[in-house]
Regions:
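Terminal amphipathic alpha-helical/low-complexity segments used for targeting or macromolecular assembly
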Residues: 1-82, 199-211
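Flexible, glycine/small-residue-enriched loop-and-beta-strand segment within the central core
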Residues: 89-99, 104-173, 198-211
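Extracytoplasmic/periplasmic beta-strand context in beta-sandwich domains
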Residues: 171, 192-193
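Conserved G/P- and acidic residue-centered "switch" motifs that form tight phosphate/ATP-binding loops
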Residues: 179, 197
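Short helix N-cap motif at coil->helix boundaries in the Bergerat
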Residues: 187
Length: 211
């Protein structure tokens, strides 16, 4: 046997003896937050949703604003120090919501967070606003199978939403964006704009004062 053949044989022998790396299958939660098809009936997700509902009930029953803020800080994926939220508040899981400093929301905020919702500093959210990340298949066979998916929402600093604003899945907004009352935001926009209408469009640009 030639030297090269011996070396090659030993190489393949040693490779075969190496422990094979195990690749764990993604959980339904991991698939969900990645925007892939997932099963909302998964036991882990059902338990997470049940835990979120307990916090939701506690939050909505609490009359002290500081205690409500503490519930939010123990519930959301991340928050800053200054959080002020009025009831009623509705969410799926809560753990996929990330809010910055000086976050304020008025009555009846809905944040459905099958995918991450990220909002920067100094946000002011009017009453009856909705941030919706869930999506359902258009094909009826897929939809009836129970599979769902979603897309994240990302919003920059200094966001102001008037009453009844809806932000749909996959939207990214820049800094200093104002969404006028009743706006339905279906696509992404950059910095320093006022949005209005259904679907929302740029009404005007905002001149920003420089320091």
């Amino acid at each position: 046997m030639g030297v090269s053949l011996v070396v090659t044989s030993l190489l393949y022998y040693n490779i075969g003896k190496q422990p094979q790396k195990e690749y764990a299958m993604p959980t339904e939660y991991e698939k969900m937050i990645a925007g892939e098809f997932y099963k909302p009936s998964d036991l882990e997700l059902r338990a997470l949703a049940a835990s979120s509902r307990e916090k939701q009930w506690a939050f909505n029953a609490e009359t002290d604003r500081l205690k409500r803020a503490e519930i939010v800080k123990s519930w959301f994926g991340s928050t800053a120090e200054n959080v002020a939220m009025n009831p009623q508040f509705v969410t799926d899981y809560g753990v996929n919501i990330h809010i910055g400093e000086n976050f304020y929301s008025n009555w009846n905020l809905t944040m459905l967070d099958v995918c991450p919702i990220r909002i920067g500093d100094n946000a002011m959210i009017g009453p009856n606003c909705q941030f919706l990340t869930p999506l359902h298949p258009l094909d009826p066979t897929e939809r009836n199978s129970g599979l769902e998916y979603g897309a994240p929402i990302t919003i920059g600093d200094n966001f102001w939403a008037g009453g009844g604003v809806t932000i749909l899945p996959g939207v990214t907004l820049g800094d200093n964006v104002v969404a006028g009352a009743g706006a339905v935001v279906t696509k992404s926009f950059g910095d320093n704009v006022v949005l209005g209408g259904n679907p929302a469009r740029v009404i005007k640009e905002i001149p920003v004062k420089k320091d």
